[in-house]
């Protein structure tokens, strides 16, 4: 049941954001937001 639940959750997360736009999962999505907003935190801009 747990595995089925996990398989059900993952596709939904994948469909929420295009794969090319989200290469690093949640971390990648967060970095993309920083890049779009001009990345105000210098150390994170790399």
Curated annotation (Swiss-Prot):
Modified residues (4-hydroxyproline): 40
Disulfide bonds: 39-45
Gene Ontology CC, one term: extracellular region
Localization: Secreted
D-tryptophan modification, residue list: 41
Free-text note regarding domains: The cysteine framework is C-C.
Identification of the protein by name: Contryphan-C
Species of origin: Conus caracteristicus
């Amino acid at each position: 049941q747990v595995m089925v639940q996990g398989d059900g959750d993952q596709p939904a997360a994948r469909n929420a954001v295009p794969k090319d736009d989200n290469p690093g999962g949640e971390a990648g999505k967060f970095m993309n937001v920083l890049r779009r907003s001009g990345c105000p935190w210098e150390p994170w801009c790399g």
